[in-house]
C-alpha cells in the first residue's frame, strides 16, 4: 500500500516545472538573504562564505580527465591528484551561490568558467564512489542553469547527462551482488537522482525512484542493520550507505515525490529503521569495534597503510554519524537535541542552507 501511495505521488510531481530542486530556489534564496541581513549567526557564517567566494574569483579551474578515488590507498598519486582537482567543486558551488545572493555577474561568469572546464575535460567512468564527489557541481549547475548562455548550459548539461548514463549503464550496477547492492549503489542512485532533478530528466528520476525501492529492500534489513554493516563490520559503512539515501530521500520529498524515509520494503526494511538502529551507538549506549570481522581486503589494506580509523578494533566514534543526523533530523525532529549535543562545532554554513531547504 505504501509503495502504491508513493508511486501515485510520483505521477503527480512528474509534471513539475524545471525549478531548482537540488539547489536553493529563488524563494529560498530570498529567505537566505533575509537571514544574512537580520540574523547575527547567519551574518557571521556568511562573512566567511563571502570571503571564500571573493578569493575564488582569482583562481583558475584545475579539472581532471577522470576522477580516481575509489579503491586507492592514501598516498596514491592518482588519488592525490584527484583530491587537488576536486577542490574546484566547492569553488564552483560557492561562486554560483554567491551570484544568486548578490546578483553580481562576476560570480556567475567564474562559476560558469569552472563548470565548463570540467564539462570539457572530465570523462565519466561510471564509478559512483568517484562520482559522489560531484554533488556540489550538480548543485552549482542547478543554481545558475537559467542564467548562463544556452551554449554553455548545453555543454554542462551534456556532461552531467553523460555522468548519469555512465552510472546507469555500468555493468557492475546491473549485478544483484557486490557493488550492485552495497553502498556503491546508494551513491549511484543519489548521483543519478541529483542529475535527474537538475536536468528535469524524468527518465533519470523514474529510474532512481524505482531502484531506490529495490535498494531499500536488498541493502537494508528489517532489524535496522545493513548489508554494508554485515559485510564490513563497521558503522562507518552503515553511515556511508545511509547518507546518500537520506540525501536522495530529501530531494524526492522536496519535489513532492513522497516520503522514502518511512517507506517500507515488502520485507519490512526502511531507512528510518536503519537510522533508528544507529541511535544507541550515537548516544554511547552501545559500543562497536570497527572492522574486526570485515570480509573486504581493501579494509585490511588501509589498516596496513596506517590510515586513521581503519585499524581492526578501532572504537566507533559517535561524531562520525553527523552526516546522517544532519539529514535525518529533517524527517524526525526528535533527533534535534541529539544532533545539537553531538555537533560540538555548532551550526555551519551548510547546515544553514539545509535548514532553509527543508523548512518550507
What are the residue ranges of the model-derived segments?
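Short amphipathic alpha-helical face segments that pack within enzyme cores
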Residues: 90, 191, 243-247
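Bacterial Sec-dependent N-terminal signal peptides
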Residues: 1-20
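Loop-centered beta-sheet repeat module
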Residues: 174, 178, 182-198, 202
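Long, repeat-rich segments with strong aromatic
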Residues: 199, 203-289
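Intrinsically disordered and other compositionally biased segments
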Residues: 6, 11, 63-64, 68-71, ...
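Extracellular glycan-targeting catalytic surfaces
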Residues: 18-178, 186, 222, 251-256, ...
Amino acid at each position: 500500500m505504501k509503495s502504491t501511495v508513493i508511486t501515485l505521488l510520483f505521477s503527480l510531481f512528474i509534471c513539475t516545472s524545471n525549478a531548482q530542486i537540488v539547489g536553493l530556489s529563488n524563494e529560498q534564496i530570498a529567505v537566505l538573504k533575509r537571514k544574512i541581513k537580520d540574523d547575527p549567526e547567519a551574518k557571521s557564517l556568511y562573512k566567511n562564505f563571502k570571503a571564500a567566494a571573493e578569493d575564488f574569483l582569482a583562481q583558475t579551474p584545475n579539472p581532471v580527465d577522470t576522477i580516481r578515488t575509489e579503491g586507492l590507498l592514501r598516498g596514491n598519486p592518482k588519488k592525490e591528484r584527484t583530491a587537488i582537482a576536486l577542490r574546484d567543486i566547492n569553488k564552483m558551488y560557492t561562486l554560483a551561490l554567491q551570484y544568486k545572493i548578490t546578483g553580481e555577474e562576476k560570480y556567475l561568469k567564474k562559476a560558469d568558467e569552472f563548470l565548463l572546464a570540467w564539462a570539457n575535460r572530465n570523462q565519466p567512468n561510471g564509478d559512483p564512489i568517484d562520482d559522489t564527489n560531484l554533488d556540489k557541481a550538480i548543485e552549482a549547475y542547478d543554481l545558475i542553469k537559467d542564467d548562463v548562455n544556452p551554449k554553455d548550459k548545453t555543454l554542462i548539461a551534456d556532461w552531467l547527462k553523460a555522468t548519469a548514463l555512465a552510472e546507469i549503464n555500468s555493468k557492475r550496477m546491473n549485478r544483484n551482488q557486490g557493488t550492485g547492492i552495497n553502498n556503491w549503489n546508494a551513491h549511484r542512485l543519489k548521483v543519478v537522482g541529483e542529475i535527474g532533478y537538475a536536468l528535469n530528466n524524468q527518465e533519470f528520476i523514474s529510474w532512481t525512484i524505482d531502484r531506490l525501492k529495490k535498494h531499500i529492500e536488498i541493502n537494508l534489513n528489517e532489524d535496522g542493520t545493513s548489508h554494508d554493516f554485515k559485510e564490513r563490520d563497521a558503522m562507518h559503512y552503515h553511515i556511508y550507505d545511509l547518507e546518500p539515501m537520506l540525501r536522495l530521500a530529501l530531494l524526492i520529498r522536496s519535489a513532492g515525490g513522497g516520503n522514502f524515509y518511512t517507506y517500507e520494503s515488502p520485507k519490512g526494511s526502511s531507512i528510518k529503521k536503519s537510522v533508528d538502529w544507529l541511535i544507541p551507538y550515537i548516544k554511547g549506549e552501545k559500543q562497536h569495534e570497527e572492522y574486526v570481522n570485515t570480509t573486504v581486503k581493501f579494509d585490511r589494506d588501509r589498516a596496513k597503510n596506517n590510515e586513521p580509523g581503519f585499524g581492526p578494533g578501532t572504537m566507533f566514534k559517535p561524531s562520525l554519524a553527523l552526516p546522517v543526523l544532519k539529514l535525518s533530523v529533517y524527517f524526525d525532529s526528535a533527533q534535534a537535541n541529539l544532533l545539537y549535543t553531538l555537533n560540538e562545532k555548532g551550526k555551519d554554513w551548510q547546515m544553514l542552507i539545509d535548514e532553509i531547504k527543508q523548512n518550507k
